[in-house]
Amino acid sequence: MFKKRGRQTVLIAAVLAFFTASSPLLARTQGEPTQVQQKLAALEKQSGGRLGVALINTADRSQILYRGDERFAMCSTSKTMVAAAVLKQSETQHDILQQKMVIKKADLTNWNPVTEKYVDKEMTLAELSAATLQYSDNTAMNKLLEHLGGTSNVTAFARSIGDTTFRLDRKEPELNTAIPGDERDTTCPLAMAKSLHKLTLGDALAGAQRAQLVEWLKGNTTGGQSIRAGLPEGWVVGDKTGAGDYGTTNDIAVIWPEDRAPLILVTYFTQPQQDAKGRKDILAAAAKIVTEGL
């Protein structure tokens, strides 16, 4: 049973009310679309945008996919890979998370909820990573990129864990342009789901580093209206959101349901109009559809 969550539950219910069995669907590469995929197709049609979803059920490695192999702009969901790359360094450079970087006024970007308090002061890489993942602080992200030696090294880290799809080309806030057809700073839902699984539940990071990444994700402050809003109360979630032009609205999550194996869920959404507003409600509705369909 899904417990009510006030206005957010009403909003999700309103979105789901638009479902129609006759909605055109994007079939999986083999076989007929499932009922869950049909519901996702109806949600997408109602939204007027393009929706990408990938869910991995770790109990049996089964997947639910919708446009799982299509590219979407990652926006700030890419920050997960950046922080993971820093954590990877800490496996061999044991004190690196305590390394400090100076925050200068010139470093500040369009979103600096944490770093703006540290102008002309120092922050450790651990503090920058937490700010990046839990508050989506763009300056913190850029400082981590500076430490890592640029975006190409983040892409190289993704390749090292077997992700051949992820590509990070620009820093914040330029990476959020999300121009249709532009492959810069993009990935596919399934590729991101597999990488998130490796990083949070697999062996891409050593135990202590994996636990730290999960702790940061669980402490995220920006995801309350996205995937989390579509799940039953009592389920534990660690996630990273993202947003950009064309109403691009993203969330990637590792989920611990009550009394069952963890889930990995990636939801990407974008729209045709550059000035379109974000639609966190679409992500919440998609999360409800796929988890009810398990």
Curated annotation (Swiss-Prot):
Pfam families: Beta-lactamase2 (PF13354)
EC number: 3.5.2.6
Keywords of this entry: Antibiotic resistance, Hydrolase, Signal
Signal peptide region: 1-27
Annotated protein name in UniProt: Beta-lactamase
GO biological process, one term: response to antibiotic
Native source species: Citrobacter koseri (Citrobacter diversus)
Top EC class, one word: hydrolase
Note from the entry: The class A beta-lactamase family has a specific amino-acid numbering system, sometimes called Ambler or ABL numbering and often misspelt as Amber. A multiple sequence alignment was used to derive a consensus sequence and then the consensus was numbered taking into account insertions and deletions. This allows use of identical numbers, e.g. for active site residues, despite differences in protein length. UniProt always uses natural numbering of residues, hence there appear to be differences in numbering between this entry and some papers.
Family: Belongs to the class-A beta-lactamase family.
Molecular functions per Gene Ontology: beta-lactamase activity
PANTHER family, alphabetized: BETA-LACTAMASE (PTHR35333), BETA-LACTAMASE-TYPE TRANSPEPTIDASE FOLD CONTAINING PROTEIN (PTHR35333:SF3)
Active site: S76, E174
InterPro entries: Beta-lactam/transpept-like, Beta-lactam_cat, Beta-lactam_class-A, Beta-lactam_class-A_AS
Amino acids binding substrate: K240, T241, G242
Catalytic activity from the UniProt record: a beta-lactam + H2O = a substituted beta-amino acid
